[in-house]
């Protein structure tokens, strides 16, 4: 149930004791955790997340990555934006690189990076932009 999912993530993200507090009293990181929990609570098929790791401490970042992988392994899909290329390279099986509203490349991760790294591909694509 939604309450079970909420309680599970609240416990994992160490927010259980704060759930009855006003959100305005939350730190930026706590608000970010709450947004992530609210995205998962209804068990959607698709999540669209904008910079989901901004403001998170290392433990919360790890937990979000773990939750994202579990979500996808259970048939869900996630579109997320990030400026941290290592995270995208590790988590994503498909990607799109967009610069100034222009789609520079899209495809399966292994086809895009080949024997390189995502950072190298990004720098090559955006060097003359």
Show where each model-derived region lies.
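Helical segment within the ABC ATPase nucleotide-binding domain
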Residues: 62-74
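Helix N-cap at the start of a conserved alpha-helix in ABC-type nucleotide-binding domains
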Residues: 58-60
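Catalytic Walker B motif of ABC-type/P-loop ATPase nucleotide-binding domains
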Residues: 47-51
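A short, surface-exposed alpha-helical micro-motif characterized by mixed small hydrophobic
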Residues: 88-90
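Short, small-residue-biased leader/transition segments that mark boundaries at the very start
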Residues: 3-5
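ABC ATPase "signature
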Residues: 106-107
């Amino acid at each position: 149930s939604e309450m079970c999912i909420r309680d599970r993530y609240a416990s994992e993200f160490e927010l259980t004791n704060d759930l009855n507090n006003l959100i305005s009293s939350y730190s930026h990181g706590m608000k970010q955790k709450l947004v992530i929990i609210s995205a998962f609570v209804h068990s959607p098929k698709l999540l669209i997340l904008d910079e989901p790791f901004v403001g998170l401490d290392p433990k919360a970042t790890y937990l979000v990555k773990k939750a994202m992988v579990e979500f996808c392994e259970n048939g869900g899909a996630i579109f997320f934006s990030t400026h941290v290329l290592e995270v995208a390279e590790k988590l994503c099986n498909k990607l799109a690189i967009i610069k100034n509203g222009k789609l520079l490349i899209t495809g399966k991760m292994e086809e895009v990076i080949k024997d390189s790294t995502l950072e190298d591909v990004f720098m090559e694509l955006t060097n003359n932009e």
